[in-house]
């Protein structure tokens, strides 16, 4: 069974499916549903009046959903309030419906962005997705632009294998490759499930080596969050490329230091380092930090 409602794609899809059927030499029943994948099933998903109390379920679901932000008032978003909050994206709405389409203990493989693994906008989705299903395998791509190298897709993309079950597995397998053309050169890691999926927010931690696993084990031992101990984490107020007119390469009267990640070296702040745009000159309060004690965190790390 395939869902497709794009008239530009349907002829090629039908041709390819018939070709595969012929080449297989086996009896295959092909069913193409030319309908909106979400809106045609939302009554069933939400157990609403008019829905099918016993919809057809599948052993396997494979999907490469559209990556598109939609309005919170879009029909697909309002049809899936259980998983939508804030600024929804079609990809996780499709993934939710894909999991719904599975029979108990069925398996699902989706290629999707990794943005759902954290953040408030995806919390409802994670709660549903990781309660009804359980992650078994996650594949990471190191490159942002080599997975769909013929398309303008710069999302960090992952492939997930999920089983529809309430039984939590002991481990998750995490593999990684540079692109979609070197699957023969995978790095593989087996990680405890409770280390990867953790907390009341169901965050998914995508560790890639044993060092990251050890760091994560230590972090999970913390019993308080930063706000709980009176500490706030925030990004700097000044975005350089949006405020080019106030940037200065050298100190002058009224200049204020502008710190970049390059200024943090071996646990210390080194300033100046003779890089461009190390200073700003402005009277705009919204671009200046108060003169207080700060802990600088170098959050950007190399792949």
Regions found by a protein language model. Give the residues of each.
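Signature of N6-adenine DNA methyltransferases within the class I
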Residues: 3-14, 35-225
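Conserved helix-turn-beta segment of the N-terminal RecA-like "Helicase ATP-binding" lobe
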Residues: 16-25
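Generic marker of residues within folded, mature protein domains
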Residues: 22, 150-152, 248-249, 287
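Conserved SAM-binding strand-loop segment of SAM-dependent methyltransferases
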Residues: 24-37
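Short, structurally constrained coil/turn elements
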Residues: 26, 131-134, 252
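Residues that flank catalytic or metal-binding motifs in active/ligand-binding sites
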Residues: 33, 155-158, 255, 293
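Polybasic, glycine- and aromatic-enriched phosphate-binding surface used to engage nucleic acids
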Residues: 213-303
């Amino acid at each position: 069974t395939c869902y497709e409602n794009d008239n530009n794609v349907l002829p090629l899809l039908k041709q390819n499916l018939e070709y595969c059927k012929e080449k297989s030499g086996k009896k295959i029943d092909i069913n193409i549903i030319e309908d909106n994948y979400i809106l045609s099933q939302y009554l069933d998903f939400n157990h609403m009046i008019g829905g099918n109390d016993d919809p057809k379920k599948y052993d396997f679901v494979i999907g490469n959903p559209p990556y598109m932000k939609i309005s919170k008032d879009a029909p697909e978003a309002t049809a899936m309030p259980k998983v939508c909050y804030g600024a929804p994206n079609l990809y996780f709405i499709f993934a939710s419906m894909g999991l719904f389409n599975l029979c108990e203990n069925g398996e699902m493989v989706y290629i999707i962005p990794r943005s759902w693994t954290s953040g408030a906008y995806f919390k409802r989705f994670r709660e549903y997705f990781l309660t009804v299903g359980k992650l078994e395998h996650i594949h990471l791509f190191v490159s942002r632009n080599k997975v769909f190298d013929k398309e303008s897709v710069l999302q960090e993309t992952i492939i997930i294998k999920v089983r529809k079950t309430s039984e939590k597995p002991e481990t998750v397998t995490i593999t990684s490759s540079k692109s979609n053309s070197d699957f023969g050169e995978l790095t593989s890691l087996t990680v405890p499930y409770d280390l990867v999926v953790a907390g009341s927010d169901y965050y998914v931690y995508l560790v890639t080596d044993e060092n990251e696993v050890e760091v994560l084990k230590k972090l999970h031992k913390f019993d308080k969050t930063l706000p709980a101990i009176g500490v706030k984490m925030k990004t700097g107020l000044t975005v350089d490329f949006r405020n080019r007119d106030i940037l200065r390469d050298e100190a002058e009267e009224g200049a204020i230091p502008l710190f970049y990640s390059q200024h943090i070296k071996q646990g210390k702040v080194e300033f100046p380092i003779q890089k461009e745009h190390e200073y700003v000159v402005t009277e705009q309060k919204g671009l200046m930090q108060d003169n207080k004690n700060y802990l600088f965190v170098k959050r950007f790390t190399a792949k």
